[in-house]
Amino acid sequence: MQTASLKNGTLKIGTRGSKLALAQAYETRRRLMEAHGLPEEAIEIIPMSTAGDRIQDRALSEIGGKGLFTEEIEQALTDGRIDLAVHSTKDMPTVLPDGLHLSVFLEREDPRDAFIGRTASRLLDLPQGATVGSSSLRRQALIRRLRPDIQVVIFRGNVDTRLRKLEAGEVDGTFLACAGLRRLGLGDVITDLADPESFPPAPGQGAIGIETRIGDTRIDTLLAPLAHRETGIALACERAFLAALDGSCRTPIAGLATVNGDTVSFHGMILKPDGSEAHEIKTEGPASNAAAIGTEAAEHLRAKAGPQFFEGWE
């Protein structure tokens, strides 16, 4: 399909309007300009407001999960109002609308969670009964697993908002994705980087995913030079794991795949929301089999945890 935006010579990128989302869209534009020798005016960035951005007073798990950050943008993509959409992959549901796919992943930034502490530099050093802000069920469960004494409070809003709340003394610390902070030039606020062994990240964390229309070969050809092989393999594994567990913002699921040559290694974890129970798996296999490795890891954990473990999941 050749859209109007290509006919008039402008490539249109859809994105959320937050500073972080725009930084990711600008990074995508920069790479496209470099790959094809395009001038800046050949690529238009179109910020869009999503339900996830507008509803800031409740946890995502209460209001519908990950699709809240993508629905309006994906509709614009389906309608041909934009040519591609730039996303934080960790915010992407595993089931996409008919006719759309994640065609390219840019090289992944550091996938770890970053701790920003006000009264201590590390989670484990916070005083007894301290408060930590997080809106992620995964982070909440991991915090409670490591520090059952800590009070976890819902912490919505963009990065600047959360950092302001922290500075104002609303909480003693918070976790944010290291990649997002670095993309915003805020890496210096990080007081500790979470150990992915004990505090594994969300599947897809740190990776920019580009969504296009299936069959739009012109756009996919333009994007092909931006694709990063190892990131694509890792995310195939992580997203298959997430899909097999029916993962969304409503469920505490962690997973990280790393690629070394032709081998993919995967560490996955599922937790009860209160952190009282967790099950994990470490496995590896051929990179060509990445998605199957993720699926098998999920099936293993589902069997290991037993049906009662999932009763609280929606």
From Swiss-Prot:
Q: Name one GO molecular function term.
A: hydroxymethylbilane synthase activity
- Residue positions where S-(dipyrrolylmethanemethyl)cysteine is found in the record: C249
Pathway as given in its UniProt record: Porphyrin-containing compound metabolism; protoporphyrin-IX biosynthesis; coproporphyrinogen-III from 5-aminolevulinate: step 2/4
**Catalytic reaction list:** 4 porphobilinogen + H2O = hydroxymethylbilane + 4 NH4(+)
Gene3D superfamilies registered for this protein in UniProt: Periplasmic binding protein-like II, Porphobilinogen deaminase, C-terminal domain
Cofactor mode of binding and number, as noted: Binds 1 dipyrromethane group covalently.
Report the cofactors: dipyrromethane
Uppermost EC category: transferase
Q: Name one GO biological process term.
A: protoporphyrinogen IX biosynthetic process
What keywords is this UniProt entry annotated with? Porphyrin biosynthesis, Transferase
**Cellular component per GO, a single term:** cytoplasm
The annotated subunit structure for this chain is: Monomer.
Misc. comment: The porphobilinogen subunits are added to the dipyrromethane group.
Function of the protein: Tetrapolymerization of the monopyrrole PBG into the hydroxymethylbilane pre-uroporphyrinogen in several discrete steps.
Identify this protein by name.
Answer: Porphobilinogen deaminase
Gene coding for it: hemC
